[in-house]
């Protein structure tokens, strides 16, 4: 069971996924800080000194903090746009590599074809000797 787990855990795809999750979490924190500390304060200054973190409405002790929700929407939009652009660039690069791979397969030379025929004839001769 341990060997099966090691095979699963150390496959390229699983390790790649783990690295992606860690990088994604770090990127999410960076974007959250960007939105919270830079974008929404600048937007607040443009809108006349509005502090998005304090935007809320409520009744009594209950409050709906829609300012935080607006910041979370900005987080999502920036992360979604970044992932979209990354995937677009990645797909463009991988499609170019696939095109190059398809073009790289050369036709066999006359010598290679002749050597292949000689190999096949030798195999036939050896198999007929083994039968006899």
Curated annotation (Swiss-Prot):
Keyword presence, Kinase: no
Compartmental location: Cell membrane
CC annotations in GO: plasma membrane
Domain of life: Bacteria
TM ranges: 14-34, 38-58, 67-87
Keywords, sorted A to Z: Cell membrane, Ion channel, Ion transport, Membrane, Transmembrane, Transmembrane helix, Transport
Membrane topology, record value: Multi-pass membrane protein
GO MF term set: mechanosensitive monoatomic ion channel activity
Main location (coarse class): membrane
Function: Channel that opens in response to stretch forces in the membrane lipid bilayer. May participate in the regulation of osmotic pressure changes within the cell.
Family: Belongs to the MscL family.
Assembly with partners or alone: Homopentamer.
Protein name per its UniProtKB record: Large-conductance mechanosensitive channel
UniProt organism field: Bacillus cereus (strain G9842)
Annotated gene: mscL
């Amino acid at each position: 069971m341990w060997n099966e787990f090691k095979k699963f855990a150390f496959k390229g795809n699983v390790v790649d996924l783990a690295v992606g999750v860690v990088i994604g979490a770090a990127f999410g924190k960076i974007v959250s800080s960007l939105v919270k500390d830079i974008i929404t304060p600048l937007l607040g200054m443009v809108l006349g000194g509005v502090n998005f973190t304090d935007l809320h409405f409520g009744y009594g002790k209950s409050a709906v903090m829609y300012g935080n929700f607006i910041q979370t929407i900005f987080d999502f939009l920036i992360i979604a746009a970044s992932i979209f652009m990354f995937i677009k660039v990645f797909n463009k690069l991988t499609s170019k590599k696939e095109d190059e791979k398809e073009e790289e397969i050369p036709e066999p030379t006359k010598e290679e074809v002749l050597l292949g025929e000689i190999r096949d004839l030798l195999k036939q001769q050896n198999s007929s000797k083994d039968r006899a």
